[in-house]
Amino acid sequence: MKKWKKKTFIPLLYLTSIVFLPWWVSFLFNKSLESWIINCCNTSKSETFLNDIQEKSILEKFMELEDLVRLNEIIKEYPETHLQKFRIGIHKETIQLIKMHNEDRIHTILHFSTNIICFIILSGYSILSNEELIILNSWVQEFLYNLSDTIKAFSILLLTDLCIGFHSPHGWELMIGSVYKDFGFAHNDQIISGLVSTFPVILDTIFKYWIFRYLNRVSPSLVVIYHSMND
């Protein structure tokens, strides 16, 4: 009995850790790496890195400041005290703009580093926990085996419609855009459109191949029900 409880508890603990481990790792590394990255960015003498979004935003801000400077030259009849305050305001705005750029740069480096570290840790954790994965796989297979063919076909149809259906490109666009943003990459409409138009097609081809090679051999009745629902 104790052995059975242990075999049940360990895979559940492993599953819980897989779900929450990325959050814990991300939080810990964000806190530990933030000060180090800030120091590196402040002391680094390398060239300033700007992605397309940051460059566009900063150029727009500087154009606004340039317009203000031109306005300053036009209104020469203003008292000297007013012009001095005007110059001080432009100087403060420029400093604030540089600070915003530095914060964006730190945020980009921090998130990219954290994501890479999380991926490495999760990969190593999954490789080392081979026994727990085998137990979880047996649970999933037993659960699927106990389902009726109708429920299986309905679940497959629902999943495929969500992932590769005619309305799925909007979801893929949001997901790919969020990944780009999370890794600090510039938003590129051409790359995102290319991925959205090709990735679901690749998934659809893989899924049809899986039905042809695996489901036709394991459960022909499930394939018949699936095609009936799909039609």
Swiss-Prot record:
Cellular localisation: Plastid, Chloroplast inner membrane
GO annotations of cellular component type: chloroplast inner membrane
An example Gene Ontology biological process: potassium ion transport
GO molecular function: antiporter activity; proton transmembrane transporter activity
Family annotation (InterPro entries): CemA
Lineage top rank: taxon: Eukaryota
Key words of the record: Antiport, Chloroplast, Hydrogen ion transport, Ion transport, Membrane, Plastid, Plastid inner membrane, Potassium, Potassium transport, Transmembrane, Transmembrane helix, Transport
Membrane topology category: Multi-pass membrane protein
Regions that span the bilayer: 9-29, 116-136, 191-211
Free-text function comment from the UniProt entry: Contributes to K(+)/H(+) antiport activity by supporting proton efflux to control proton extrusion and homeostasis in chloroplasts in a light-dependent manner to modulate photosynthesis. Prevents excessive induction of non-photochemical quenching (NPQ) under continuous-light conditions. Indirectly promotes efficient inorganic carbon uptake into chloroplasts.
Family the UniProt entry places it in: Belongs to the CemA family.
The protein's name in its UniProt record: Potassium/proton antiporter CemA
Organism: Manihot esculenta
Gene giving rise to this polypeptide: cemA
